[in-house]
């Protein structure tokens, strides 16, 4: 009975909600097995598991796999792999990893790891603050698959919800900062500062950039090609007219609020741009930078309802004067109209972005932080202007009380005017203060010169203030200090720095302050957007696979969410163990020797990897090597990243089969052999084939002194099958938001850690606050992200995916991704030309349909097919990339045969509609493709004058049913109008009026 009771207790604890479980002990001991290939033990045969994650993650059932294998003309998955992947690079052994763990057990194990993190009260500041995450937003947005599994809103007809929310974000940023135009977020504040520096350089072509030494240390960055100088404002000399821009922090990292008007005036007189890093909450009561002439404003919106997350993910904001809008990096939502003249939303000015401008893009960044920007936007919508001002005043008042108490206790405050941060020279022993802080489990900022910093936030209450006063030896309570302050202590509110301008006056920020209304508003927006909860999203090179509930569950655990990124490492041992586990597994999967988790996106990983190559070559005395070879079919981020890393780009041609043109490559290598730095290649190629000569390409580059950068965007076709580090690559980034299941979030977050071979390991990113390089020979390249380990809080997603799949499951996922793609290609090849195949006639995990001939035969283009697919309930494949006028399809391993067949049926049906146009049965101008997508308003309108039926428009195949159909909410977008009439803030209320309101106003 005792034994039964003990087992029942374990089972009950495993099934209980995490916060109700008993204190965690050590993780359950497991047998270490490589690849899971041995016969099952007797106990496993008697107690079969029903919660094996692999069969939940992989879509096709065994019968469906057999049917698909038969359709593509092979007997087994292994035969398909042999015919798809070059034999010279195949991995012929199992991955050396622990056997898979079932879902419930892995969450128990992960919670044991998370419990090693110590949740202290952190008042370290430096751009990271505790905040209260409104539960309606956490429950209905952050933890909602309808929001987190959306793709970037490049198809606006099925993305109006998140586009509206991101427009709210932009409007909020513009209003609070006093600027003209904002983008839809960047990766973090440090990245935003680097982007501001690049913007200044692009604007006036000057090479020098001043940085106020009182910026946050992680914000001070040095990018190749721009000379940065740390100076105080009075030391900055602009008379040489060689300074592109100046960056200052307001309030600064020590908390001081300072008037920068004179500095800005001096800068502008000499053609220098002024950039301000700031705090949105402070600006709710503080004069905004836009009112004293700043050109660029940036910062983090983390404290608007996003947890600390050990550094990320968080959305940075970026706003500029109107004259700089076309220089601005990142995505930007704008207002335009649809085919019916309705005011709608879209991504504006995309010609600035890397997928079009390539090496001349305004930024190499492809991923933003859409999910976190949406959380911050909803925080602003939920609280409104009055609510935000109340929160800001509360934080400021708490800081005033603390300041008064510290003065009474004999401590010196370094600044008289502040918002939420105090810098203190202790009147007693610093060690004594820190010892008392440890007793209360409180973290403060420790300066190298012995001063201490305390930054308060919206979560601080009276007890917190009492504890902080106690650790500094103050005998008075917060209540007694407050009573003695009197009305004359108003801080910012009694100075010229007090904000007098209104903000967030738009109705959207004044309508949803009850939980009922905010929940309904979020649901209304969610219902406008297609996501993985509706149907497959077959975007080539984007890997829109399952983001499982078990993987996503840990991101909101307080043990991961409530850790400041700059706490001592002994308070983050859970995170450190997770990083080590994940690094070990990723090194085994890729064949690399070392991983850096700092890059927040694939593009940032590209920059970090190329910068490591450049640092390595410089250390060898080969600084002259700067030429980077890039195939013309490469991701647009590749040339943009190479340009940012200070390299010169040499394009390489692609042959008719979609592979690198070897003869042209050899010619370019020979031409640039003295200056060759690297080649950037994607494998399998962006054309969807495993190139046979990949090993020879790597050998050729190495022979001539270069390094091989392998873009990891297509890693989903390689896991367990081949390893980049084995066939010659020196460095790769890994898109954890593709291959390793971090959701796309409607355009971010992402993670792009880089893996390197041993010789590049000393040149991985470091950090100015937390030491992360352990290599004794380290010569780090600097910092590429604000936080030491990037977006730490989403790494548990990839960790859970790898642990629950195990070596065997990971390999099988890649196999089924390839099988699914080949099955779809086989079904569609009779109706569309498959543009590229491997040497034995098979594709990799994605393939390209050539739709270019339809332009001549029926005046139909790829965009028409993309929009028509929305009527069938599908998001479009990748459009016009890597070949203009084509569609690239990637099904992933998570979709079952039924969903693949539905998509293929839709594409075949659309091909028949094109044939109807070609053969004169359908009008060449007014047809289901040209008029798509068809909205519910359109189909139910009393007026229908089109030469095809409503059924053809809205229900073209039997599986498209009224009760389950996803409806596009707007007609086709007018992109040209949107760029010609750029509006990037919420439109006036007249745009939201009903016809009844218009009639009423007209009659009056």
From Swiss-Prot:
Native source organism of the sequence: Gallus gallus (Chicken)
Catalysis performed (reactions): N(6)-[(R)-lipoyl]-L-lysyl-[glycine-cleavage complex H protein] + glycine + H(+) = N(6)-[(R)-S(8)-aminomethyldihydrolipoyl]-L-lysyl-[glycine-cleavage complex H protein] + CO2
UniProt cross-references to InterPro entries, sorted A to Z: ArAA_b-elim_lyase/Thr_aldolase, GcvP, GDC-P_C, GDC-P_N, GDC_P, PyrdxlP-dep_Trfase, PyrdxlP-dep_Trfase_major, PyrdxlP-dep_Trfase_small
EC number: 1.4.4.2
Known regulation of activity: Stimulated by lipoic acid. Inhibited in presence of methylamine.
Protein family membership: Belongs to the GcvP family.
Tissue expression pattern: Liver (at protein level).
Function: The glycine cleavage system catalyzes the degradation of glycine. The P protein (GLDC) binds the alpha-amino group of glycine through its pyridoxal phosphate cofactor; CO(2) is released and the remaining methylamine moiety is then transferred to the lipoamide cofactor of the H protein (GCSH).
Protein keywords: Mitochondrion, Oxidoreductase, Pyridoxal phosphate, Transit peptide
GO molecular function: glycine binding; glycine dehydrogenase (decarboxylating) activity; glycine dehydrogenase activity; lyase activity; protein homodimerization activity; pyridoxal binding; pyridoxal phosphate binding
Domain of life, per lineage: Eukaryota
Record's protein name: Glycine dehydrogenase (decarboxylating), mitochondrial
Requisite cofactors: pyridoxal 5'-phosphate
GO terms classed as biological process: glycine catabolic process; glycine decarboxylation via glycine cleavage system; response to lipoic acid; response to methylamine
Phylogenetic lineage: Eukaryota, Metazoa, Chordata, Craniata, Vertebrata
